[in-house]
């Protein structure tokens, strides 16, 4: 497969896409969740170039103590965008305590809710999305998505969490390509563009949790294979299992014919 990527052209295309969308839909402001990682950093920079830094609002959403929140502040300062911080830690704790009270024992007519670590981990992104939607509506702004194609392909994202947005800024770029685009924008700190991606939830890097390198996912997407059949199959299985995260909910047809009730 013949693959070429022009980072500067991709950057300029995305800036124009944001401007065109804003004009078509009649909005001038965007809200972005700023994690301090490459995806939100590059998204914020693209939006600032497209709409002006004064129209970009960064929201920092630590869950309790965030050890690298200084990186989030650096992004906002470097781009000249205004920001606010909302700590979702107490909200997450309250929800965790409420669900813990359900316990492993169910009363008559109730069902058992077993403890589930991944469910708890995914509460964070969903709470963040609730706060971001609040800010966007209050400011009359659109919510810019920050997820990339590599994450979406293997389902490394939270349904109704970071997948929720009004436009998906980077969903046409792999993780590798996001870095390349980011490196064409001198206004953002280079080290943040090249920062090791983590989920900010489990204490592990993305690649550690996935068991797959982003470079391999990139090659799988752009070349059809990463060069290792076993890894290709691992990516393919994740892709198929997580298609539901990339599609609108299935609408059932009440007028379908030929089905037995």
Positions of predicted regions on the chain:
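Generic detector of well-ordered alpha-helical packing
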Residues: 40, 149-152
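ATP/NTP-dependent adenylation/nucleotidyl-transfer catalytic domains that generate, transfer
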Residues: 1-32, 46, 54-57, 63-65, ...
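Conserved G/P- and acidic residue-centered "switch" motifs that form tight phosphate/ATP-binding loops
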Residues: 37
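Active-site signature of alpha/beta-hydrolase-fold catalytic machinery across serine-
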Residues: 42-49
């Amino acid at each position: 497969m013949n693959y070429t990527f022009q980072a500067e052209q991709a950057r300029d295309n995305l800036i124009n896409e944001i401007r065109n969308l804003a004009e078509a839909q009649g909005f001038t402001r965007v809200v972005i969740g700023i994690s301090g990682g490459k995806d939100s950093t590059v998204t914020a920079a693209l939006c600032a170039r497209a709409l002006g830094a004064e129209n970009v609002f960064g929201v920092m959403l630590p869950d309790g103590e965030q050890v690298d929140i200084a990186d989030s502040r650096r992004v906002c300062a470097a781009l000249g965008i205004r920001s606010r911080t909302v700590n979702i830690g107490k909200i997450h704790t309250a929800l965790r305590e409420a669900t813990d009270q359900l316990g492993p024992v169910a009363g008559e007519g109730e069902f058992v809710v077993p403890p589930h670590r991944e469910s708890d981990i995914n509460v964070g992104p969903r709470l963040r999305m609730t706060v971001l939607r609040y800010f966007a509506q209050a400011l009359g702004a659109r919510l810019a998505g920050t997820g990339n194609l590599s994450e979406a392909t293997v389902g490394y994202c939270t349904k109704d969490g970071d997948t929720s947005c009004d436009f998906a800024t980077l969903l046409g770029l792999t993780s590798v390509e996001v870095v390349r685009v980011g490196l064409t924008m001198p206004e953002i700190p280079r080290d943040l563009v090249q920062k090791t991606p983590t989920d900010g939830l489990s204490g592990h890097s993305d690649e550690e949790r996935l068991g797959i390198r982003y470079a391999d996912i990139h090659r799988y997407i752009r070349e059809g294979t990463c060069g290792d059949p076993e890894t290709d199959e691992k990516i393919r299985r994740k892709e198929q299992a997580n298609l539901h995260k990339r599609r609108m909910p299935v609408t059932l047809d009440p007028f379908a014919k030929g089905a037995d009730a």
